[in-house]
Amino acid sequence: MSSSQSVPAMSSRERVLSALARKPVDRTPVCNPTSVATVELMDLVDAPFPEANRNPELMARLAATSYTELGFDSIMPVFSIIQESSALGCSIQWEQKDNWPTVRMGDPIWEDADDIKIPPDYLTHPDTKCVLGAISRLKKEYGDEVAIIGKTMGPWSLGYHCFGVEPFLLLSLDDPEKTKLALDRMKEATVQFGLAQIEAGADALTLPDHATGDLVSGEYYKRFLRDLHIELAERIPIPLILHICGRTVDRMDYIAQTGFAAFHFDS
């Protein structure tokens, strides 16, 4: 990506997508691929948590403040990381206005790779359907002006949510092959939700997969996730922004091999 005075003026959408494609831009885009939700913005547009996580109109209204109030070049309506897990059957702690919802990982739904099943109503569950509805609304209202970024959770994150963090990490130590099988099955939830968001109007997707430095090593990333992430980049045909929290220096070389458009290293 480079900025040049010779590049004609771009819309916010053109600017973000050109940057993700490593093409010249008229100026450096300002893009938040995770969430801009704050209590102040909720109050400003009357779209508070937890309702803004479950109502597509409120979700879209709050997300739009990224563009209308903050002047960013992107809108990202998925404020949490629970939608897929909720649709898969996990219990959710919805919290109040000043906190985001979380998965109750102490109450896992799966113990073995053979337990993994994607429900037939996965994409029509209220929490996944809400995201699709919000993206569709945003695309209709802002789609020509600003980049609409969705979010689909990676299989390692889904493993934490659906197996529990400690059981999933222990499984990776005790039975790496069964862990790979579990990841292979869970990735279908990632792909299905990602493709549905593209159909709804998403221009790019954030893909959080929390193989964080405090829990797994760079070699773990290479062993379990690099090739799987390469596959996701091939199967989901819009720019993907990988997110991993925390210190990730030891896996950057592997992440660079995936074909993802960008890497979001903390939030």
Q: Could you say what each language-model-derived stretch is?
A:
Residues 2-35, 40, 49, 73, ...:
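Active-site loop segments of alpha/beta catalytic cores
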Residues 37-38, 42-70:
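Active-site-flanking structural segment that lines cofactor/substrate pockets
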Residues 42, 85-89, 138:
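Pocket-flanking alpha-helical
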Residues 52, 87-102, 157-171:
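Aromatic- and acidic-residue-enriched segments that line the glycan-binding/catalytic groove
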Residues 59-66, 105-111, 178-182, 236-239:
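Short C-terminal domain-edge/linker segments immediately following a structured domain
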Residues 62-92:
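Glycine-rich, N-terminal phosphate-binding loop and its surrounding beta-alpha-beta segment
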Residues 80-121, 145:
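A contiguous, low-structure linker/loop signature
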